[in-house]
Amino acid sequence: MTTSADQTDVLVIGSGPGGAGVTLKLVQAGYKVTCLEQGPWVTPPEHPHYHREWEIEKQRGWAYDPNVRGLPEDYPVTGFTTPYLMNNVGGSTMHYAGHWPRYKPVDFRKGTEHGLEGTIDWPISYEELAPYYDENDAIYGISGMVGDPSYPDRTGVDRDPPVKPGKLGRNFAQALGDLGWHWWPSDNAIITRPREGREADIAAGNELSGSPTGSLSTPTHTHWPTAIALGADLRTHARVEQIHTKNGKATGATYIDTRTGARHEINAKIVVVSASGIGTPRLLLMSAQKGHPDGLANSNGLVGKYLMHHILRVLASVVRTSRMEGYKGAFGAPLYSHEFYHTDTNRGFVNGFGMQVARSFGAAYTAMGSHTGYVAPWGKSHRKFFNEHFGNHLMVFMFGEDLPVETNCVTLDPDAKDSSGLPAARVNWEPHENDIALANYGIDRIFEAARALGAVETNDTGVLNPPPGWHLMGTCRMGNNPEDSVTNKWHQTWDVPNLFVVDGSSLTTGGAVNPTSTIGALAVRAGDYISRRFSDIVDQRTTPSNEDAPAI
């Protein structure tokens, strides 16, 4: 049974950084916004960090992979992938570390730089996005240090002081300095000063399951309280079944209450999809209907194509020359190195990578040999092993920019279903030979830095294939024309002018840094555009080209 339809100005699907950013901007401008989130609110006592067995719970109900959690709000993701997805208010920020780098100017013009495989230029520049980066940072609350010479000047942007580097950060910075390599204290979405009822970070440890105190900046703290106070209608346990269209325009959606199974309809003048780099193409493909037989916004067949994860290798080692105490402090990276960020074809590949120093995990992870492969023995030698390893652990991530390849994609699984009977997402991802060459070169450089620090028992994961899907990018990418993209530069789908996509799907290329800062900036920009051009968008019968679209 389907209830009678509600009416709203803008329907937003998904409550993570994309959906939250658009919603907040629109309700601040006075628009009526309804946001549908298929998961629940997570209250502070529900965070695993409230419990002694948090390391165990992170392997069960708080596992990164929805296939492991299997909660009613999750949907299966099949194929060659290990997806990192959360379905709850705030989206997958409930699993992020809060590392908050921006893309660099060169990241927006990779098509011009090399154009390999499916690489194209972004339809916007760093300079166009920079003021929205600033606005987004102010909403979240960011810690860090301005002045990194590898970025354009940002001296006017307010920051909290950086998270404390600890012995881990100071020791690795010394090693990088001895090699003459770039390093800089990381920007993190972690506040180090109290802010609007949120507590400052106290270096209490791992926050990879959100922060019940609010020190880790997630939309549950930074967006939704304000948006709801301004009139946003956030509906949880609301799983969207299909987006509807009529006469070439989106008209709203049908959603299922996952608690009762009841179906509800909602009509809207504009629809914004912000359901993640897997969830958004899945929903658009599920929305196949008359006039859109291959899925919504998919007349060119590119919905779900060009999936990027970042190519990833992880070094884990033990340092005996000095205590690292990596378990102390927020998990957000204390520092990074972009010494090898830019393309140098003399290395035999295009694109580059960044190094991120990461805190180590807790005692149980150490004993199990997480990332290191060195498992604590039972018996008399257990304590000796533990004393040598816990507190001496070094972990460094190599994030490389993978190429957008058309066959790396999200489709609908013909067999698997979610708890509502809707098709699961199926993912295919294979590393390009350029990605593998980049990863091999990158891990060699990280080994070099670890040796400079005195690391022993050094191990690495190899090219993680598939990589953990922390970053789900590119599957409905922005572009300059309908032949090679799904949306124009304002996130309007080429096929349906009042249907927008604003999330990791929008990213044209992936850069070699974490994408959440960029997703948030794009959301502020898209919300600004929709609020200023609302009437124009509602009246449009076709999506304008980037040249013809009305400016802000």
Swiss-Prot record:
It comes from the Bacteria. The gene is mpdB. SUPFAM superfamilies: FAD-linked reductases, C-terminal domain, FAD/NAD(P)-binding domain. Its EC number is 1.1.1.400. Gene3D superfamilies: FAD/NAD(P)-binding domain (3.50.50.60). GO terms for molecular function: flavin adenine dinucleotide binding; oxidoreductase activity, acting on CH-OH group of donors. The lineage of its organism: Bacteria, Bacillati, Actinomycetota, Actinomycetes, Mycobacteriales. Its cofactor is FAD. It is found in: Cytoplasm. Disulfide bonds: none annotated. Signal peptide: none annotated. Induction: Induced in the presence of MTBE or tert-butyl alcohol (TBA). Coiled coil: none annotated. Keywords: Cytoplasm, FAD, Flavoprotein, Oxidoreductase. The keyword ATP-binding does not apply. Involved in the degradation of methyl tert-butyl ether (MTBE). Catalyzes the conversion of 2-methyl 1,2-propanediol (2-M1,2-PD) to hydroxyisobutyraldehyde. It holds the Pfam family GMC_oxred_N. Belongs to the GMC oxidoreductase family. GO terms for cellular component: cytoplasm. This is 2-methyl-1,2-propanediol dehydrogenase. InterPro entries: FAD/NAD-bd_sf, GMC_OxRdtase_N, GMC_OxRtase_C, P2Ox-like.
